[in-house]
C-alpha cells in the first residue's frame, strides 16, 4: 500500500465521521516547514550507557518537561516513541542489547580468582557445567560428595546463622553487590551476639540447596544470597532466602522468607544487610520462618 492509498483511506474515514480530512502530506520536507525532533538516533551511542537509558524518542512532544520527569522516575521502557506502528531503531537496538546482557549474565561463570580474592571456601552442587545447571535444576539442589566433606571439615558446626553465597542465575548480582552486603551482614550478625558460621560460596546452587547445608552443619538459620534471574537491562539483582532449621525431607517453599530485588536500583545492599540481620533475630526468637512467622 502506497502513500496515496493511505491518504485516500484517511479521507474516506474522516468523511464518514463528518470531519474534514487533513491535507495530503508533502513529498519533501524542508527545515522551514518541519520541526527538528527532540532527540536524534545515533548508532555511535553506547546502548548500555546511562545516556542511552535516558534517551527520549518521542518526537515533537507537547510537554517535553513531563516526558523528562517521567523518564527520570522509572527504569521502565517509557518515552521511546514510535515510527508508525513500529518501535524506533534506537529503542529496538537497546531492547536487543539489554536482552543480550541478560543472557550473558546467566551464562557467565563467577571467576575462581574472584572467589579466592574474597577468601571464601568454594564448593559446588552436583552440577559440573553451566549447561547442565540450566537443564537439570534438581541436581543444583544437592551438594556433591566432595562439597559435603569440605563443609564438615572446614566450617563451624551448629551456628545460629549460616550465610551462603551462590551464583544462581546471575553472576553479576554476586560480584557487584558482594562488597556492600556481606561485610555489613556478617558484622551485624556478630554485633547481635549470634554465633555465625563460616561463609562460603556454592557454585551452580539452587535455592533448596540451603536445606542440605543447614542439615549438615546443624544451623538454626540459613541465609542464602543468590543471583536472581535477570530481567531486561537489570542483571545485578540479588535475592536472600532465609529459612529456620531446614531439613531436606520436610522443608517446603512456604517455609522460606525471601527478600528480593537487592541492588542499587532496588533495595540497596547495605540496607538489605540490616533487614536480614533483623530477620534472622526474629526467626531465632520465634523459631520459625516463612508463613509460620508472626509480624
Swiss-Prot record:
GO BP term, pick one: ethanolamine catabolic process
Alphabetic keyword roster: Bacterial microcompartment, Cobalamin, Cobalt, Lyase
InterPro entries: EutC (IPR009246), EutC_C (IPR042251)
Binding note for cofactor: Binds between the large and small subunits.
Pathway field: Amine and polyamine degradation; ethanolamine degradation
GO molecular function: cobalamin binding; ethanolamine ammonia-lyase activity
EC number: 4.3.1.7
Chain sites annotated for binding adenosylcob(III)alamin: 207, 228, 258
Protein's UniProt keywords contain Translocase: no
Family from the record: Belongs to the EutC family.
PANTHER family: ETHANOLAMINE AMMONIA-LYASE LIGHT CHAIN, ETHANOLAMINE AMMONIA-LYASE SMALL SUBUNIT
Name used for this protein in its record: Ethanolamine ammonia-lyase small subunit
Species this chain originates from: Escherichia coli O139:H28 (strain E24377A / ETEC)
Amino acid at each position: 500500500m502506497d502513500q496515496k492509498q493511505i491518504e485516500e483511506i484517511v479521507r474516506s474515514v474522516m468523511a464518514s465521521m463528518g470531519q474534514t480530512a487533513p491535507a495530503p502530506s508533502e513529498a519533501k520536507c524542508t527545515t522551514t516547514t518541519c520541526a527538528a525532533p527532540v532527540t536524534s538516533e545515533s548508532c555511535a551511542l553506547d546502548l548500555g550507557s546511562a545516556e542511552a537509558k535516558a534517551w527520549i524518542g518521542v518526537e515533537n512532544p507537547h510537554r517535553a518537561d513531563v516526558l523528562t520527569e517521567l523518564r527520570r522516575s522509572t527504569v521502565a521502557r517509557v518515552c521511546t516513541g514510535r515510527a508508525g506502528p513500529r518501535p524506533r531503531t534506537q529503542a529496538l537496538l537497546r531492547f536487543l542489547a539489554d536482552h543480550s546482557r541478560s543472557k550473558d549474565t546467566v551464562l557467565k561463570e563467577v571467576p575462581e580468582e574472584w572467589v579466592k580474592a574474597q577468601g571464601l571456601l568454594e564448593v559446588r552442587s552436583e552440577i559440573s557445567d553451566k549447561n547442565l545447571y540450566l537443564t537439570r535444576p534438581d541436581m543444583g539442589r544437592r551438594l556433591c560428595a566432595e562439597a559435603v566433606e569440605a563443609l564438615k571439615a572446614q566450617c563451624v558446626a551448629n551456628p545460629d546463622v549460616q550465610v551462603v553465597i551462590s551464583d544462581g542465575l546471575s553472576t553479576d548480582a554476586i560480584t557487584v553487590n558482594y562488597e556492600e552486603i556481606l561485610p555489613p551482614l556478617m558484622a551485624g550478625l556478630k554485633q547481635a551476639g549470634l554465633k555465625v558460621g563460616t561463609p562460603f560460596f556454592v557454585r551452580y546452587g539452587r535455592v533448596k540447596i540451603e536445606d542440605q547445608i543447614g542439615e549438615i552443619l546443624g544451623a538454626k538459620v540459613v541465609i542464602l544470597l543468590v543471583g536472581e534471574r535477570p530481567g531486561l537491562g537489570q542483571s545485578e539483582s540479588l535475592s536472600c532466602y532465609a529459612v529456620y532449621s531446614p531439613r531436606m525431607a520436610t522443608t517446603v517453599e512456604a517455609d522460606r522468607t525471601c527478600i528480593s530485588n537487592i541492588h542499587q536500583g532496588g533495595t540497596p545492599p547495605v540496607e538489605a544487610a540490616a533487614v536480614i540481620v533483623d530477620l534472622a533475630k526474629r526467626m531465632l526468637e520465634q523459631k520459625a520462618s516463612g508463613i509460620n512467622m508472626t509480624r
